[in-house]
């Protein structure tokens, strides 16, 4: 299913031996084996917190639009006793406007989250938000499922439906029949044709989802305001979230951007997964920039090399994204090859960050 479990729990801090060897080999000629505890304690990561809270505030704003529109949509459906054919006949223009506005809000909410995902998903004490908002599966995959169930206004409980971006996107864009209205064609613009990207959501499910989304966004923001990032948090986020390229590229390969009508991913339809990957890496580059002086305390050469490789990985993905947005079509085979290259680079970077943390005496947290 689209936008469901990414298997991040399986991304261990124990990296392949070849990666560790690479990290050891690239540490430069620094003869000191002493840790720089004082440097790590003195690190000021206020900028990381500001980056996080700026993005949580943006997410709140965009999700508030989704919720407000969802409430209006629910009221319209309720006014016709959830007769969706009648809803479109009597209120079609309003529905079309609300859903179009909601899609715009969704497209803005997505990067607001993805750019901070490296921190949210990479810091264990924040990572449950990533499961519920962006990465968790539905009840069919209990190990990776979201923690919440949706209590619908009609009294029905929708047990662990999948993460909130997944539910919202697939309802708005009509790719998951489970979340769509019954008894009417999925023809939002009233032109007599059901076209890709048109979805008339089940109002009970949709309003429950955007209410939960609003609550989760508010809660994440509250915890972000209390969050005081440490070097351990930053190093951990980089080691957990950088070597996840292969699973992201797999989702891209299975999405409509490559597979077309044969896509097995229900999500990733509003924008390409490549855009998400670039956004995630952008946040990781920002995070590394804030700890690079610590790495340089032990080895300026290593600090520079890691920065170059991480920014190079971002540039690599941005180039793929830009080519795709300009009309270039990739094949599934190319996606596999490109993903393998991205993963190779990412594992090397994570190995270097792991080695730097060890030399600095900075603890890496368990995912």
Where are the regions a protein language model picked out?
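C-terminal motif of bacterial Sec signal peptides marking the signal peptidase cleavage site
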Residues: 22-26
């Amino acid at each position: 299913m689209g936008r469901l479990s990414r298997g991040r729990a399986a991304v261990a801090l124990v990296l392949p031996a070849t990666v560790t060897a690479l990290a050891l080999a690239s540490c430069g000629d620094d003869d000191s084996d002493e840790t720089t505890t004082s440097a790590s304690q003195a690190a000021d990561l206020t900028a990381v917190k500001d980056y996080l809270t700026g993005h949580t505030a943006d997410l709140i704003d965009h999700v508030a639009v989704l919720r407000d529109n969802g409430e209006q949509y629910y009221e319209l459906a309720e006014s016709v006793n959830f007769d969706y054919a009648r809803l479109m006949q009597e209120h079609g223009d309003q529905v079309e406007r609300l859903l179009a506005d909601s899609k715009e809000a969704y497209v803005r909410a997505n990067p607001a989250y993805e750019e901070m995902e490296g921190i949210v998903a990479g810091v264990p004490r924040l990572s449950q938000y990533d499961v519920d908002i962006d990465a968790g599966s539905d009840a069919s995959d209990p190990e990776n499922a979201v923690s919440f169930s949706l209590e619908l206004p009609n009294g029905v409980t929708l047990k662990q439906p999948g993460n909130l971006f997944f539910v919202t996107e697939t309802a708005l864009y009509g790719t998951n029949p489970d979340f769509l209205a019954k008894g009417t064609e999925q023809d939002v613009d009233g032109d007599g044709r059901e076209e890709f990207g048109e979805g008339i959501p089940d109002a009970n499910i949709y309003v429950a989802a955007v209410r939960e989304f609003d609550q989760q966004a508010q809660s994440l923001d509250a915890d972000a305001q209390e969050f005081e990032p440490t070097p351990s948090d930053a190093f951990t986020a980089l080691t957990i979230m950088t070597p996840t390229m292969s699973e992201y590229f797999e989702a891209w390969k299975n999405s409509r951007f490559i597979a077309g009508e044969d896509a097995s991913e229900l999500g990733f339809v509003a924008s390409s997964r490549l855009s998400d990957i670039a956004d995630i890496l952008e946040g990781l580059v920002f995070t590394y920039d804030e700890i690079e002086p610590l790495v340089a305390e032990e080895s300026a050469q290593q600090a520079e090399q890691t920065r170059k490789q991480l920014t190079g990985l971002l540039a690599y993905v941005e180039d793929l994204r830009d080519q795709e947005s300009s009309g270039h079509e990739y094949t599934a085979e190319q996606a596999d090859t490109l993903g393998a290259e991205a993963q190779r680079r990412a594992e090397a970077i994570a190995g270097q960050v792991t080695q730097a943390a060890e030399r600095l005496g900075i603890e890496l947290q368990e995912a």
